[in-house]
Regions:
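Amphipathic, Lys/Arg-enriched alpha-helical "gate/interface" segment within cytosolic domains
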Residues: 2-139
Length: 139
């Protein structure tokens, strides 16, 4: 079994997301809000973890509790997706409504080719199935 890196994350009051390590070594994020404080915390955490991803990583974002995403959230996600270190990442995003889905689609459309591979889903099962597909190495 591969060794799991410890997750350098601790819950803080007022931060509207949690993250756990997936069995495949990726991360499972659950957002309850997308406030500026939450976004700032997530951005810092996400960038910290980009740099230690030396192999393909599968991340899951559960955004079903969010009713919409702000422009700020979209910009930060794009910034993370466009980082050269993000090319090794496959991200499944589970959304609960059309508004959030459209925002995530916008992020996917604006992400440069060769960046993060993104999939958008309405249920966890489809997201997991997609994440589990064999990884294609993008050059």
């Amino acid at each position: 079994a591969m060794e799991m890196k410890p997750l350098n994350w601790k819950p803080e009051p007022g931060i509207g997301y949690t993250v756990t390590r997936r069995s495949d070594g990726g991360m499972h994020y659950t957002f309850t809000d997308a406030s500026p404080a939450t976004l700032a915390h997530w951005r810092e955490f996400a960038f910290q973890h980009l740099y230690d991803s030396d192999r393909l990583t599968r991340n899951l974002y559960d955004l079903r509790q969010l009713s919409a995403l702000s422009e700020t959230a979209i910009m930060i996600a794009l910034e993370a997706n466009s980082d050269p270190a993000a090319r090794n990442i496959r991200v499944a995003v589970v959304v609960g409504n059309e508004k959030t889905r459209a925002a995530i689609q916008q992020i996917a459309d604006l992400t440069a080719p060769g960046g993060v591979e993104m999939g958008i889903f309405m249920d966890m099962e489809s997201a997991e199935t997609w994440l589990d597909r064999p990884l294609t190495i993008l050059t």
